[in-house]
């Protein structure tokens, strides 16, 4: 009984071992098939590059000219067109100057102070012709001169720098002086005595900027008295006037009156020191 059980047990073990071996063999076979399939897949070209070698062979393949079916005139025309398609030859010009000419040019530079160079015959190297062409001699313009008269004239045209020791009078501050003149007071140019004269307390530099600042200050002062300007003008005038215009002047650095080209926007009419309305006509 025990022997039969042992025999059955050994048979089952052998069966299991055989099945295990068969499964291992089957697994090995499947792995081999899978690897072979993957090799075949990777041997295929990617992204449509299968025709690269074929395209290269087509590009590098020389094109044969069909001359058997063409006549003699056709052959001549094809040869001329092929020659026309060739790139044009580039000519290189080599300019050479003999040593004797170089020595002569240096001697003329040392003696006369001018540079004169001549260009003789120079060979022109081309693609199909080996002939030479003669170049006409050219003379360069003088670049420098050592003539003492020209150097002295050049020095004389250079302005001298300003001397720093002298004081600059134009930048000295001066008082701002305003003056009002009527049109009858300036018939012949620069007036001498204004109708209204006022010297302000402000000091300005004696230059264009200072004059502009003084002019602005005078305008500010006049605007303050603008509503009563007619009474001020007639009382200061002392006699009758008819359609007079008032102009603003300021004094410059030389104590002279300068017209600012500024005038009142109205006309003044005075009778016995009293202003009245000027008529439109007459």
UniProtKB/Swiss-Prot annotation:
Changing residue 164 to T: In strain: Usa8, Usa12, Usa16, Zim7, Zim10, Zim13, Zim15, Zim16, Zim18, Zim22, Zim39, Zim42, Z36 and Z50. Changing residue 75 to A: In strain: Usa3, Zim7, Zim10, Zim13, Zim16, Zim18, Zim22, Zim39, Zim41, Zim42, Z36 and Z50. Residues 103-156 are annotated as: Disordered. It comes from the Eukaryota. Residues 106-118, 141-156 have a biased composition (Low complexity). Changing residue 163 to K: In strain: Z50. Residues 128-140 have a biased composition (Polar residues). Expressed in follicle cells during vitelline membrane formation. Changing residue 140 to V: In strain: Zim41. Changing residue 108 to S: In strain: Zim10, Zim13, Zim16, Zim18, Zim39, Z36 and Z50. This is Follicle cell protein 3C-1.
């Amino acid at each position: 009984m025990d022997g039969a059980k042992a025999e059955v047990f050994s048979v089952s073990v052998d069966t299991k071992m055989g099945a295990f071996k068969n499964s291992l063999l089957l697994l090995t076979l499947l792995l081999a098939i899978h690897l072979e399939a993957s090799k075949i897949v990777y041997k295929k070209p990617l992204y449509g590059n299968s025709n690269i070698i074929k395209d290269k062979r087509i590009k590098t393949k020389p094109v044969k000219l069909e001359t058997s079916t063409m006549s003699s005139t056709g052959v001549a025309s094809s040869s001329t067109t092929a020659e026309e398609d060739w790139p044009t030859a580039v000519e290189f010009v080599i300019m050479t100057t003999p040593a004797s000419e170089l020595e002569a040019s240096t001697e003329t530079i040392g003696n006369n102070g001018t540079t004169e160079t001549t260009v003789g015959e120079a060979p022109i190297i081309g693609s199909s012709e080996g002939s030479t062409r003669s170049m006409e001699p050219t003379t360069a313009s003088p670049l420098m001169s050592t003539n003492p008269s020209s150097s002295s004239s050049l020095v004389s045209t250079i302005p001298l720098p300003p001397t720093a020791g002298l004081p600059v009078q134009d930048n000295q501050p001066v008082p701002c002086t305003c003056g009002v003149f009527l049109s009858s007071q300036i018939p012949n140019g620069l007036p001498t005595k204004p109708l209204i004269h006022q010297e302000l307390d402000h000091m300005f530099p004696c230059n264009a900027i200072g004059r502009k600042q003084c002019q602005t200050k005078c305008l500010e002062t006049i605007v303050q008295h603008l509503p009563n300007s007619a009474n001020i003008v007639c009382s200061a005038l002392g006699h009758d006037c008819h359609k007079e215009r008032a102009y603003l002047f300021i004094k410059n650095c030389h104590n002279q009156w300068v017209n600012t080209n500024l005038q009142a926007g109205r006309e003044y009419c005075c009778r016995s020191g009293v202003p009245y309305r000027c008529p439109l006509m007459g």
